[in-house]
Each structure stands twice: as C-alpha cells, then as structure tokens.
A protein has these predicted regions:
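A compositional/biophysical signature of low hydrophobicity enriched in polar/charged and small residues
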Residues: 1-170
Length: 170
C-alpha cells in the first residue's frame, strides 16, 4: 500500500516520480524557488505564457504535490535562533514502537527544524536552532534528556554554515 503525504489540503502519493514535467513546468518551479512572491503576471512573462495559462500550471503543480507550500525564509540570527545544533541520537531498542514514540516526541522539541532516520552509528539526526549555547544547555536539560527510548545523544555545534539552500536542482 502506498503511503500519502498531506500537502496544501490534498493527499498525494509520496512517490510522484511518474509526473511528466515539460520545460515550462521546470521553468516555473525554478522561478518560484528563487522568489515565491513573484506575481503570476511576472511569472507568466518570465516563462513565456499568458497569465491564465501560467496560473493553471501553478495550480496543477500544487495539486500534484510538487509545490508543497509558499513560505518566507526568515533571518534566524535576527530572530534569536542563530545557533545551529546537529544532534545524533541512538535509541536503546530498534522496534517500531520505540521509533514511533521517539518520532512523536521529537516533533515537540523546541527549535527542532528537521529530524531524519539515518544509517550508520546513529538512528536519527536532528537539526535544531537556538539562540546560544546557554539556551541549548537549557533545552538539553529540559527536553532532550527526556526523549523516550534514547540511549545516547551526541551534540555537534555548527561553527560556520558554509552554505544552505532550499532550492532543489531541476
């Protein structure tokens, strides 16, 4: 049975690899990744379509789940979330119940931006943002130590972000 992901109020298959994208669809996606606030008229001009045709294409890309949402990328340091911390987590048991309990709890960790199941010596990597080392120490003592089923946590403080992008190569 294929799993589904809820996006923009619609369900879509997780594997959208069957979707055929032409050159114009790809141009629309590239343009929206660079500036999602672009007006439909400006986007249409950029991809050589009429405004109504462009809007239909964008709506189609949304309904297919290829556009999951429109967001603002915020300045984390200006909002007291300038420190990035990567956390490696090892669970004490490798059971579906342990994984489910951890995953549910991880969603409630303050500042947690991402959580990934990984291969190798860790079961998960979490990426969180916080103000500074003092606020991270507080978060560690108040939340991370109480995550269910955790045997080991290893913390990696990011010293310098070399680059980060939200854009997928199309």
């Amino acid at each position: 049975m294929k799993s589904t992901t809820k996006l923009l109020g619609k369900s879509r298959p997780d594997d959208a690899s069957h979707v055929e994208l032409d050159r114009t669809d790809k141009a629309i996606l590239r343009a929206l990744q660079k500036d999602a606030s672009i007006s439909n008229v400006a986007l249409a001009a950029k991809v050589n379509l009429s405004a109504p045709a462009c809007l239909r294409r964008v709506e189609r890309l949304k309904s297919l789940g290829l556009i999951r949402g429109i967001v603002a990328l915020l300045n984390a340091p200006a909002l007291d979330a300038g420190m990035v911390v990567i956390i490696g987590v090892v669970l004490d048991r490798s059971t579906p119940e342990s994984f489910a309990a951890f995953e549910k709890a991880a969603q409630n960790v303050s500042g947690c931006m991402e959580c990934h199941v990984v291969t190798g010596e860790f079961d998960y990597f979490m990426m969180l943002r916080t103000r500074d080392s003092e606020s991270f120490n507080r978060l560690h003592a108040e939340q991370l130590l109480y995550l269910p089923g955790v045997r080991q946590i290893r913390t990696f403080m990011v010293l310098k972000q070399v680059f980060s992008t939200t854009q997928i190569a199309i």
